Protein backbone atom coordinates (compact mmCIF):
# COMPACT_ATOMS: atom_id res chain seq x y z
CA UNK A 1 0.00 0.00 0.00
CA UNK A 2 1.49 3.34 -1.02
CA UNK A 3 0.62 6.88 0.02
CA UNK A 4 1.27 10.14 -1.80
CA UNK A 5 1.39 13.66 -0.44
CA UNK A 6 -2.23 14.18 -1.47
CA UNK A 7 -3.33 11.54 1.01
CA UNK A 8 -2.17 13.52 4.03
CA UNK A 9 -4.93 15.29 5.93
CA UNK A 10 -4.86 19.05 5.69
CA UNK A 11 -4.97 21.23 8.80
CA UNK A 12 -8.10 22.92 7.52
CA UNK A 13 -10.05 19.69 7.26
CA UNK A 14 -8.89 18.64 10.72
CA UNK A 15 -10.11 21.89 12.24
CA UNK A 16 -13.39 21.81 10.34
CA UNK A 17 -14.21 18.27 11.37
CA UNK A 18 -13.29 18.76 15.02
CA UNK A 19 -15.37 21.91 15.36
CA UNK A 20 -18.63 20.16 14.49
CA UNK A 21 -18.25 17.63 17.30
CA UNK A 22 -18.63 19.76 20.41
CA UNK A 23 -20.79 16.95 21.72
CA UNK A 24 -19.64 13.62 20.29
CA UNK A 25 -22.38 11.52 18.73
CA UNK A 26 -22.44 8.54 16.39
CA UNK A 27 -24.45 10.38 13.72
CA UNK A 28 -22.37 12.61 11.46
CA UNK A 29 -23.51 16.28 11.37
CA UNK A 30 -25.75 17.29 8.49
CA UNK A 31 -23.17 19.77 7.18
CA UNK A 32 -20.41 17.13 7.00
CA UNK A 33 -19.31 15.27 3.86
CA UNK A 34 -20.77 12.01 5.17
CA UNK A 35 -23.77 10.90 3.08
CA UNK A 36 -26.79 9.48 4.93
CA UNK A 37 -28.29 6.46 3.18
CA UNK A 38 -31.42 4.45 3.90
CA UNK A 39 -33.17 1.38 2.54
CA UNK A 40 -34.90 3.29 -0.25
CA UNK A 41 -31.75 5.12 -1.41
CA UNK A 42 -28.91 2.67 -0.74
CA UNK A 43 -28.91 0.55 -3.91
CA UNK A 44 -29.37 3.47 -6.28
CA UNK A 45 -26.56 5.43 -4.63
CA UNK A 46 -24.07 2.54 -4.66
CA UNK A 47 -24.90 1.70 -8.28
CA UNK A 48 -24.20 5.28 -9.35
CA UNK A 49 -20.82 5.62 -7.60
CA UNK A 50 -17.53 3.84 -8.25
CA UNK A 51 -16.29 3.72 -4.67
CA UNK A 52 -18.18 4.05 -1.37
CA UNK A 53 -17.25 3.25 2.22
CA UNK A 54 -20.45 2.56 4.15
CA UNK A 55 -20.68 2.61 7.94
CA UNK A 56 -23.51 0.51 9.34
CA UNK A 57 -24.07 1.83 12.87
CA UNK A 58 -26.43 2.38 15.77
CA UNK A 59 -26.78 5.81 17.44
CA UNK A 60 -26.32 4.30 20.92
CA UNK A 61 -23.12 2.42 20.01
CA UNK A 62 -20.11 3.62 22.03
CA UNK A 63 -17.56 2.48 19.44
CA UNK A 64 -19.54 4.33 16.76
CA UNK A 65 -19.46 7.51 18.84
CA UNK A 66 -15.71 7.19 19.36
CA UNK A 67 -15.10 6.72 15.65
CA UNK A 68 -17.47 9.45 14.47
CA UNK A 69 -15.04 12.44 14.52
CA UNK A 70 -12.41 10.42 12.65
CA UNK A 71 -14.98 9.28 10.10
CA UNK A 72 -16.02 12.87 9.43
CA UNK A 73 -12.39 13.97 9.04
CA UNK A 74 -11.78 11.21 6.54
CA UNK A 75 -14.91 12.12 4.60
CA UNK A 76 -13.83 15.77 4.30
CA UNK A 77 -10.50 14.70 2.79
CA UNK A 78 -11.84 12.01 0.48
CA UNK A 79 -14.70 14.02 -1.00
CA UNK A 80 -12.11 15.92 -3.05
CA UNK A 81 -11.03 12.60 -4.57
CA UNK A 82 -14.58 11.58 -5.47
CA UNK A 83 -14.62 8.91 -2.76
CA UNK A 84 -17.77 8.84 -0.65
CA UNK A 85 -18.17 7.92 3.00
CA UNK A 86 -21.73 7.04 3.94
CA UNK A 87 -23.71 6.10 7.05
CA UNK A 88 -26.65 3.73 7.48
CA UNK A 89 -28.55 3.78 10.77
CA UNK A 90 -29.39 0.13 11.44
CA UNK A 91 -32.01 1.01 14.05
CA UNK A 92 -34.06 2.60 11.27
CA UNK A 93 -33.01 0.31 8.39
CA UNK A 94 -33.02 -3.13 9.93
CA UNK A 95 -33.90 -5.03 6.74
CA UNK A 96 -31.02 -3.42 4.83
CA UNK A 97 -28.56 -4.24 7.60
CA UNK A 98 -29.78 -7.83 7.76
CA UNK A 99 -29.43 -8.11 3.99
CA UNK A 100 -25.75 -7.19 4.30
CA UNK A 101 -25.17 -9.53 7.27
CA UNK A 102 -24.11 -6.84 9.71
CA UNK A 103 -22.72 -8.68 12.78
CA UNK A 104 -22.14 -5.68 15.05
CA UNK A 105 -21.49 -1.95 15.19
CA UNK A 106 -19.81 -0.23 13.60
CA UNK A 107 -19.40 -2.40 10.50
CA UNK A 108 -17.52 -0.76 7.64
CA UNK A 109 -18.01 -2.12 4.13
CA UNK A 110 -16.40 -1.01 0.87
CA UNK A 111 -18.45 -1.11 -2.33
CA UNK A 112 -16.44 -0.90 -5.55
CA UNK A 113 -17.34 -0.58 -9.23
CA UNK A 114 -20.99 0.24 -8.44
CA UNK A 115 -21.53 -3.35 -7.28
CA UNK A 116 -24.12 -3.45 -4.52
CA UNK A 117 -23.99 -7.24 -4.12
CA UNK A 118 -20.31 -7.59 -3.27
CA UNK A 119 -18.41 -5.71 -0.61
CA UNK A 120 -15.09 -5.78 1.23
CA UNK A 121 -14.94 -5.47 5.00
CA UNK A 122 -12.72 -2.69 6.31
CA UNK A 123 -10.86 -4.06 9.32
CA UNK A 124 -8.11 -1.48 9.68
CA UNK A 125 -7.62 1.19 12.35
CA UNK A 126 -10.60 3.49 12.87
CA UNK A 127 -8.63 6.67 12.44
CA UNK A 128 -9.05 9.31 9.76
CA UNK A 129 -5.53 8.81 8.44
CA UNK A 130 -5.87 5.03 8.16
CA UNK A 131 -9.28 5.25 6.49
CA UNK A 132 -8.03 7.85 3.99
CA UNK A 133 -4.96 5.80 3.14
CA UNK A 134 -6.96 2.62 2.70
CA UNK A 135 -9.65 4.20 0.55
CA UNK A 136 -7.13 5.91 -1.73
CA UNK A 137 -5.58 2.50 -2.23
CA UNK A 138 -9.02 1.16 -3.21
CA UNK A 139 -9.39 3.86 -5.86
CA UNK A 140 -6.20 2.88 -7.62
CA UNK A 141 -5.83 0.13 -10.25
CA UNK A 142 -4.75 -3.30 -9.08
CA UNK A 143 -1.49 -2.93 -11.00
CA UNK A 144 0.49 0.29 -11.32
CA UNK A 145 2.00 0.47 -14.81
CA UNK A 146 5.19 2.54 -14.78
CA UNK A 147 7.87 3.46 -17.29
CA UNK A 148 10.66 4.35 -14.86
CA UNK A 149 10.73 1.71 -12.11
CA UNK A 150 13.66 3.12 -10.05
CA UNK A 151 12.08 6.57 -9.96
CA UNK A 152 8.68 5.15 -9.02
CA UNK A 153 10.10 3.11 -6.15
CA UNK A 154 12.18 6.04 -4.92
CA UNK A 155 9.31 8.55 -4.93
CA UNK A 156 6.63 6.46 -3.22
CA UNK A 157 6.31 5.29 0.37
CA UNK A 158 5.29 1.66 0.80
CA UNK A 159 4.02 -0.16 3.88
CA UNK A 160 3.30 -3.51 2.21
CA UNK A 161 5.58 -5.62 -0.03
CA UNK A 162 5.86 -4.48 -3.64
CA UNK A 163 5.54 -7.20 -6.29
CA UNK A 164 7.18 -6.12 -9.56
CA UNK A 165 7.19 -7.70 -13.00
CA UNK A 166 9.66 -6.07 -15.36
CA UNK A 167 11.42 -6.59 -18.68
CA UNK A 168 9.85 -8.61 -21.48
CA UNK A 169 6.44 -9.84 -20.31
CA UNK A 170 4.43 -12.56 -22.06
CA UNK A 171 0.65 -12.84 -22.08
CA UNK A 172 0.36 -16.01 -19.97
CA UNK A 173 2.33 -14.66 -17.04
CA UNK A 174 0.74 -11.22 -17.36
CA UNK A 175 -2.71 -12.78 -16.92
CA UNK A 176 -1.56 -14.56 -13.76
CA UNK A 177 0.09 -11.40 -12.47
CA UNK A 178 -3.11 -9.35 -12.85
CA UNK A 179 -5.18 -12.15 -11.33
CA UNK A 180 -2.93 -12.23 -8.27
CA UNK A 181 -3.01 -8.44 -8.06
CA UNK A 182 -6.80 -8.45 -7.87
CA UNK A 183 -6.82 -11.28 -5.34
CA UNK A 184 -4.23 -9.62 -3.08
CA UNK A 185 -5.26 -6.03 -3.70
CA UNK A 186 -5.07 -5.13 -0.01
CA UNK A 187 -2.06 -7.29 0.83
CA UNK A 188 0.60 -6.09 -1.60
CA UNK A 189 1.37 -3.41 -4.19
CA UNK A 190 1.69 -4.79 -7.73
CA UNK A 191 3.79 -2.91 -10.29
CA UNK A 192 4.39 -3.63 -13.97
CA UNK A 193 7.41 -2.09 -15.71
CA UNK A 194 7.50 -3.63 -19.18
CA UNK A 195 10.59 -3.21 -21.34
CA UNK A 196 10.96 -5.46 -24.37
CA UNK A 197 14.74 -4.93 -24.43
CA UNK A 198 15.32 -6.44 -20.96
CA UNK A 199 14.97 -9.99 -19.70
CA UNK A 200 11.89 -10.89 -17.69
CA UNK A 201 12.22 -10.44 -13.93
CA UNK A 202 9.82 -10.97 -11.04
CA UNK A 203 10.85 -9.27 -7.81
CA UNK A 204 9.59 -8.51 -4.33
CA UNK A 205 10.65 -5.31 -2.58
CA UNK A 206 10.13 -5.49 1.17
CA UNK A 207 9.44 -2.12 2.85
CA UNK A 208 12.20 -2.81 5.37
CA UNK A 209 14.76 -3.70 2.67
CA UNK A 210 13.88 -1.81 -0.52
CA UNK A 211 17.49 -1.93 -1.68
CA UNK A 212 17.59 -5.75 -1.48
CA UNK A 213 14.79 -7.09 -3.72
CA UNK A 214 13.99 -10.80 -3.68
CA UNK A 215 14.21 -12.06 -7.27
CA UNK A 216 12.40 -15.17 -8.52
CA UNK A 217 15.01 -17.52 -9.95
CA UNK A 218 12.84 -20.38 -11.20
CA UNK A 219 11.23 -21.04 -14.57
CA UNK A 220 8.79 -18.45 -15.86
CA UNK A 221 6.46 -21.22 -17.02
CA UNK A 222 6.22 -22.47 -13.43
CA UNK A 223 5.47 -19.13 -11.80
CA UNK A 224 2.76 -18.49 -14.39
CA UNK A 225 0.79 -21.09 -12.45
CA UNK A 226 -1.27 -19.21 -9.85
CA UNK A 227 -0.68 -21.85 -7.15
CA UNK A 228 3.10 -21.65 -7.60
CA UNK A 229 2.93 -17.84 -7.55
CA UNK A 230 0.82 -17.95 -4.37
CA UNK A 231 3.26 -20.25 -2.59
CA UNK A 232 6.21 -18.09 -3.62
CA UNK A 233 4.49 -15.00 -2.24
CA UNK A 234 3.63 -16.71 1.04
CA UNK A 235 7.31 -17.34 1.65
CA UNK A 236 9.17 -14.47 0.03
CA UNK A 237 6.82 -11.59 0.86
CA UNK A 238 7.32 -12.04 4.59
CA UNK A 239 9.99 -9.86 6.19
CA UNK A 240 13.29 -11.51 6.98
CA UNK A 241 12.89 -10.84 10.69
CA UNK A 242 9.60 -9.14 11.47
CA UNK A 243 7.44 -8.50 14.52
CA UNK A 244 4.61 -10.97 15.03
CA UNK A 245 1.20 -10.39 16.60
CA UNK A 246 -2.36 -11.44 15.92
CA UNK A 247 -2.65 -9.35 12.77
CA UNK A 248 0.09 -11.24 10.88
CA UNK A 249 0.17 -14.64 12.57
CA UNK A 250 -2.02 -16.24 9.87
CA UNK A 251 0.46 -15.22 7.16
CA UNK A 252 3.19 -17.21 8.88
CA UNK A 253 0.91 -20.20 9.35
CA UNK A 254 -0.07 -20.12 5.66
CA UNK A 255 3.58 -20.19 4.62
CA UNK A 256 3.75 -23.73 5.97
CA UNK A 257 7.26 -23.15 7.32
CA UNK A 258 8.60 -23.66 10.85
CA UNK A 259 8.71 -20.49 12.91
CA UNK A 260 11.60 -19.32 15.08
CA UNK A 261 10.61 -16.94 17.90
CA UNK A 262 12.80 -14.43 19.71
CA UNK A 263 10.96 -13.28 22.85
CA UNK A 264 12.44 -9.94 23.96
CA UNK A 265 12.01 -7.73 27.03
CA UNK A 266 12.43 -4.29 25.45
CA UNK A 267 13.41 -2.50 22.24
CA UNK A 268 17.06 -2.21 23.27
CA UNK A 269 17.27 -5.97 23.67
CA UNK A 270 15.55 -6.51 20.32
CA UNK A 271 18.09 -4.29 18.55
CA UNK A 272 20.89 -6.29 20.15
CA UNK A 273 19.72 -9.55 18.57
CA UNK A 274 18.27 -8.20 15.31
CA UNK A 275 21.46 -8.51 13.18
CA UNK A 276 21.91 -12.16 14.16
CA UNK A 277 18.34 -13.16 13.37
CA UNK A 278 18.18 -11.14 10.16
CA UNK A 279 21.27 -12.95 8.92
CA UNK A 280 19.87 -16.33 9.99
CA UNK A 281 16.62 -15.55 8.19
CA UNK A 282 18.39 -14.65 4.95
CA UNK A 283 20.56 -17.76 5.14
CA UNK A 284 17.59 -20.07 5.73
CA UNK A 285 15.02 -18.33 3.52
CA UNK A 286 12.41 -20.81 2.34
CA UNK A 287 13.34 -23.29 5.08
CA UNK A 288 11.99 -21.46 8.14
CA UNK A 289 10.80 -18.02 9.20
CA UNK A 290 12.08 -15.90 12.07
CA UNK A 291 10.07 -13.39 14.12
CA UNK A 292 10.40 -11.21 17.18
CA UNK A 293 7.66 -11.19 19.81
CA UNK A 294 7.21 -8.70 22.63
CA UNK A 295 7.33 -10.66 25.90
CA UNK A 296 5.62 -7.77 27.73
CA UNK A 297 2.48 -8.33 25.64
CA UNK A 298 2.65 -11.96 24.60
CA UNK A 299 4.86 -13.61 27.20
CA UNK A 300 2.29 -16.31 27.90
CA UNK A 301 2.75 -17.62 24.37
CA UNK A 302 6.01 -19.13 25.62
CA UNK A 303 3.91 -21.75 27.40
CA UNK A 304 2.37 -22.77 24.08
CA UNK A 305 5.91 -23.53 22.93
CA UNK A 306 6.61 -25.64 26.05
CA UNK A 307 8.98 -22.94 27.33
CA UNK A 308 9.14 -21.18 30.69
CA UNK A 309 8.55 -17.44 30.85
CA UNK A 310 12.25 -16.65 31.18
CA UNK A 311 13.10 -13.86 28.74
CA UNK A 312 14.80 -13.39 26.40
CA UNK A 313 14.31 -16.85 24.94
CA UNK A 314 14.52 -18.52 21.55
CA UNK A 315 12.19 -21.32 20.47
CA UNK A 316 11.16 -23.02 17.24
CA UNK A 317 7.67 -24.27 16.40
CA UNK A 318 7.27 -26.87 13.66
CA UNK A 319 3.61 -26.14 13.00
CA UNK A 320 3.18 -29.02 10.55
CA UNK A 321 4.11 -31.64 13.15
CA UNK A 322 3.20 -29.40 16.13
CA UNK A 323 6.62 -29.96 17.67
CA UNK A 324 8.48 -27.39 19.76
CA UNK A 325 12.20 -26.87 20.22
CA UNK A 326 14.10 -24.43 22.41
CA UNK A 327 17.36 -23.51 24.06
CA UNK A 328 17.89 -24.94 27.57
CA UNK A 329 16.36 -22.88 30.38
CA UNK A 330 17.04 -22.41 34.07
CA UNK A 331 15.27 -24.20 36.88
CA UNK A 332 12.64 -22.12 38.65
CA UNK A 333 14.93 -21.79 41.68
CA UNK A 334 17.93 -20.66 39.62
CA UNK A 335 15.79 -18.16 37.71
CA UNK A 336 14.42 -16.65 40.92
CA UNK A 337 17.97 -16.17 42.23
CA UNK A 338 19.28 -14.70 38.97
CA UNK A 339 20.73 -11.21 39.38
CA UNK A 340 21.95 -10.57 35.82
CA UNK A 341 19.85 -10.63 32.67
CA UNK A 342 19.69 -13.76 30.54
CA UNK A 343 22.03 -13.72 27.54
CA UNK A 344 21.34 -15.90 24.50
CA UNK A 345 24.57 -17.13 22.94
CA UNK A 346 24.79 -16.72 19.17
CA UNK A 347 26.47 -20.10 18.73
CA UNK A 348 23.72 -21.83 20.71
CA UNK A 349 21.01 -20.24 18.57
CA UNK A 350 22.80 -21.08 15.33
CA UNK A 351 23.42 -24.64 16.50
CA UNK A 352 19.77 -25.21 17.39
CA UNK A 353 18.63 -23.90 14.00
CA UNK A 354 21.18 -26.08 12.19
CA UNK A 355 20.26 -29.21 14.15
CA UNK A 356 16.55 -28.56 13.71
CA UNK A 357 16.80 -28.21 9.93
CA UNK A 358 18.93 -31.38 9.75
CA UNK A 359 16.38 -33.28 11.84
CA UNK A 360 18.85 -33.81 14.68
CA UNK A 361 17.21 -31.60 17.33
CA UNK A 362 15.12 -33.16 20.09
CA UNK A 363 11.66 -31.65 20.61
CA UNK A 364 10.48 -30.47 24.00
CA UNK A 365 7.73 -32.93 24.88
CA UNK A 366 5.22 -31.77 27.45
CA UNK A 367 4.14 -34.69 29.58
CA UNK A 368 2.74 -35.58 32.96
CA UNK A 369 4.61 -38.22 34.91
CA UNK A 370 3.63 -41.80 34.13
CA UNK A 371 0.81 -42.95 36.40
CA UNK A 372 2.19 -45.68 38.65
CA UNK A 373 -1.25 -46.78 39.79
CA UNK A 374 -3.97 -47.34 37.20
CA UNK A 375 -7.03 -47.45 39.46
CA UNK A 376 -9.55 -47.55 36.61
CA UNK A 377 -10.22 -49.80 33.63
CA UNK A 378 -9.64 -46.67 31.50
CA UNK A 379 -5.85 -46.58 31.11
CA UNK A 380 -4.43 -43.09 31.77
CA UNK A 381 -1.86 -42.27 29.08
CA UNK A 382 0.71 -39.46 29.22
CA UNK A 383 3.05 -38.02 26.63
CA UNK A 384 5.99 -40.11 27.83
CA UNK A 385 4.32 -43.49 27.27
CA UNK A 386 1.78 -42.64 24.57
CA UNK A 387 3.67 -44.04 21.57
CA UNK A 388 4.78 -47.19 23.40
CA UNK A 389 1.23 -48.06 24.45
CA UNK A 390 -0.63 -47.24 21.23
CA UNK A 391 1.92 -49.07 19.08
CA UNK A 392 1.61 -52.33 21.03
CA UNK A 393 0.98 -54.95 18.29
CA UNK A 394 -0.72 -57.25 20.81
CA UNK A 395 -3.64 -54.90 21.47
CA UNK A 396 -6.28 -52.82 19.78
CA UNK A 397 -5.93 -49.51 21.65
CA UNK A 398 -8.71 -46.92 21.69
CA UNK A 399 -7.63 -43.48 22.94
CA UNK A 400 -9.82 -40.59 24.03
CA UNK A 401 -7.97 -37.26 23.73
CA UNK A 402 -9.73 -34.83 26.04
CA UNK A 403 -9.53 -31.57 27.96
CA UNK A 404 -10.64 -31.43 31.61
CA UNK A 405 -12.83 -28.40 30.92
CA UNK A 406 -14.58 -29.96 27.90
CA UNK A 407 -18.31 -30.42 28.49
CA UNK A 408 -18.70 -33.03 25.73
CA UNK A 409 -15.85 -35.05 27.30
CA UNK A 410 -17.54 -34.95 30.71
CA UNK A 411 -20.83 -36.19 29.22
CA UNK A 412 -19.02 -39.00 27.42
CA UNK A 413 -17.14 -40.16 30.55
CA UNK A 414 -19.78 -42.62 31.95
CA UNK A 415 -20.22 -44.30 28.55
CA UNK A 416 -16.47 -44.48 28.04
CA UNK A 417 -16.02 -46.01 31.50
CA UNK A 418 -18.65 -48.66 30.75
CA UNK A 419 -16.89 -49.40 27.46
CA UNK A 420 -13.58 -49.88 29.27
CA UNK A 421 -15.15 -52.06 31.98
CA UNK A 422 -16.61 -54.38 29.34
CA UNK A 423 -13.27 -55.15 27.71
CA UNK A 424 -11.17 -55.09 30.88
CA UNK A 425 -13.29 -57.83 32.48
CA UNK A 426 -13.25 -60.13 29.43
CA UNK A 427 -10.19 -59.75 27.19
CA UNK A 428 -6.63 -58.46 27.00
CA UNK A 429 -6.90 -57.86 23.25
CA UNK A 430 -8.49 -54.41 23.64
CA UNK A 431 -7.27 -51.52 25.79
CA UNK A 432 -9.43 -48.45 26.39
CA UNK A 433 -7.29 -45.41 27.25
CA UNK A 434 -7.46 -41.64 27.60
CA UNK A 435 -4.99 -38.74 27.52
CA UNK A 436 -5.31 -35.19 28.85
CA UNK A 437 -4.19 -33.27 25.77
CA UNK A 438 -3.81 -30.01 27.68
CA UNK A 439 -0.97 -31.55 29.71
CA UNK A 440 0.62 -33.91 27.20
CA UNK A 441 2.05 -33.59 23.69
CA UNK A 442 1.53 -36.37 21.16
CA UNK A 443 3.07 -36.74 17.73
CA UNK A 444 1.33 -37.66 14.52
CA UNK A 445 -2.21 -37.14 15.84
CA UNK A 446 -4.39 -34.39 14.40
CA UNK A 447 -6.52 -33.09 17.25
CA UNK A 448 -8.78 -30.27 16.12
CA UNK A 449 -11.27 -30.45 18.96
CA UNK A 450 -12.35 -32.39 22.04
CA UNK A 451 -13.14 -35.16 22.43
CA UNK A 452 -11.10 -36.81 19.67
CA UNK A 453 -11.22 -40.61 19.66
CA UNK A 454 -8.66 -42.67 17.74
CA UNK A 455 -8.27 -46.44 17.38
CA UNK A 456 -4.78 -47.90 17.03
CA UNK A 457 -5.31 -51.46 15.72
CA UNK A 458 -2.90 -54.17 16.78
CA UNK A 459 -0.68 -55.97 14.32
CA UNK A 460 2.55 -54.83 12.75
CA UNK A 461 1.43 -52.47 9.95
CA UNK A 462 -1.92 -51.11 11.09
CA UNK A 463 -2.96 -47.50 10.47
CA UNK A 464 -4.81 -45.51 13.11
CA UNK A 465 -8.49 -44.73 12.52
CA UNK A 466 -10.30 -41.61 13.76
CA UNK A 467 -13.77 -42.23 15.21
CA UNK A 468 -16.49 -40.15 13.54
CA UNK A 469 -19.67 -41.81 14.84
CA UNK A 470 -22.14 -41.05 17.60
CA UNK A 471 -20.94 -41.25 21.18
CA UNK A 472 -23.11 -44.22 22.10
CA UNK A 473 -21.90 -47.47 23.61
CA UNK A 474 -23.16 -49.59 20.69
CA UNK A 475 -21.49 -47.35 18.09
CA UNK A 476 -18.15 -47.56 19.92
CA UNK A 477 -18.44 -51.35 20.16
CA UNK A 478 -19.12 -51.56 16.40
CA UNK A 479 -16.21 -49.23 15.59
CA UNK A 480 -13.68 -51.31 17.52
CA UNK A 481 -14.93 -54.61 16.03
CA UNK A 482 -14.97 -53.30 12.45
CA UNK A 483 -11.60 -51.52 12.58
CA UNK A 484 -9.64 -53.47 15.18
CA UNK A 485 -7.08 -56.15 14.34
CA UNK A 486 -8.47 -58.77 16.74
CA UNK A 487 -12.14 -58.62 15.70
CA UNK A 488 -13.36 -58.47 19.31
CA UNK A 489 -17.16 -58.36 19.57
CA UNK A 490 -17.75 -55.86 22.35
CA UNK A 491 -21.53 -56.15 22.14
CA UNK A 492 -21.36 -59.88 22.77
CA UNK A 493 -19.02 -59.34 25.72
CA UNK A 494 -21.37 -56.70 27.10
CA UNK A 495 -24.41 -58.97 26.77
CA UNK A 496 -22.52 -61.83 28.42
CA UNK A 497 -21.54 -59.52 31.26
CA UNK A 498 -25.14 -58.36 31.64
CA UNK A 499 -26.43 -61.94 31.67
CA UNK A 500 -23.78 -62.94 34.19
CA UNK A 501 -24.65 -59.96 36.37
CA UNK A 502 -28.34 -60.89 36.16
CA UNK A 503 -27.58 -64.51 37.09
CA UNK A 504 -25.47 -63.38 40.01
CA UNK A 505 -28.22 -61.04 41.11
CA UNK A 506 -30.76 -63.88 40.93
CA UNK A 507 -28.43 -66.17 42.86
CA UNK A 508 -27.92 -63.50 45.50
CA UNK A 509 -31.67 -63.02 45.73
CA UNK A 510 -32.27 -66.78 46.14
CA UNK A 511 -29.59 -66.96 48.79
CA UNK A 512 -31.17 -64.05 50.59
CA UNK A 513 -34.59 -65.74 50.42
CA UNK A 514 -33.14 -68.96 51.81
CA UNK A 515 -31.47 -67.08 54.64
CA UNK A 516 -34.73 -65.31 55.39
CA UNK A 517 -36.59 -68.66 55.43
CA UNK A 518 -34.05 -70.20 57.80
CA UNK A 519 -34.30 -67.15 60.00
CA UNK A 520 -38.10 -67.45 60.06
CA UNK A 521 -37.92 -71.15 61.00
CA UNK A 522 -35.61 -70.35 63.87
UniProtKB/Swiss-Prot annotation:
Residues 1-28 form the signal peptide. One of its GO terms (molecular function) is protein disulfide isomerase activity. Its EC number is 5.3.4.1. It comes from the Eukaryota. InterPro entries: Prot_disulphide_isomerase (IPR005792), Thioredoxin-like_sf (IPR036249), Thioredoxin_CS (IPR017937), Thioredoxin_domain (IPR013766). It catalyses: Catalyzes the rearrangement of -S-S- bonds in proteins. GO terms for biological process: positive regulation of endoplasmic reticulum unfolded protein response; protein folding; response to endoplasmic reticulum stress. It is found in: Endoplasmic reticulum lumen. Residues 497-522 are annotated as: Disordered. Its main location: endoplasmic reticulum. The N-terminus is blocked. A motif (Prevents secretion from ER) lies at residues 519-522. The record marks 126 as: Lowers pKa of C-terminal Cys of first active site. PANTHER family: PROTEIN DISULFIDE ISOMERASE, PROTEIN DISULFIDE-ISOMERASE A3. Interacts with EPS1, KAR2 and MNL1. Belongs to the protein disulfide isomerase family. Protein disulfide isomerase of ER lumen required for formation of disulfide bonds in secretory and cell-surface proteins and which unscrambles non-native disulfide bonds. Forms a complex with MNL1 to process unfolded protein-bound Man8GlcNAc2 oligosaccharides to Man7GlcNAc2, promoting degradation in unfolded protein response. This is Protein disulfide-isomerase. It comes from Saccharomyces cerevisiae (strain ATCC 204508 / S288c) (Baker's yeast). The gene is PDI1.
Amino acid sequence: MKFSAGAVLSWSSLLLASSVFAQQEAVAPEDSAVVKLATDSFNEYIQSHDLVLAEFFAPWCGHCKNMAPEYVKAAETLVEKNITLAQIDCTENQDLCMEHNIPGFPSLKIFKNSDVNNSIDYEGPRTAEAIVQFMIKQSQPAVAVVADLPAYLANETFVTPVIVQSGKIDADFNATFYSMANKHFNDYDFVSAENADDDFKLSIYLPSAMDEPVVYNGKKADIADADVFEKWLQVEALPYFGEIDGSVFAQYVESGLPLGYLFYNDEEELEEYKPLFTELAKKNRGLMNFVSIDARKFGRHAGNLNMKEQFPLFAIHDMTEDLKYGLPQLSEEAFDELSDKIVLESKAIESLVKDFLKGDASPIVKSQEIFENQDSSVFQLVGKNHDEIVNDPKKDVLVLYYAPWCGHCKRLAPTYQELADTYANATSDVLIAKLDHTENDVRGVVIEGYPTIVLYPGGKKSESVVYQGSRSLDSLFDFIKENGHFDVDGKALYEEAQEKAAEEADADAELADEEDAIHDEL
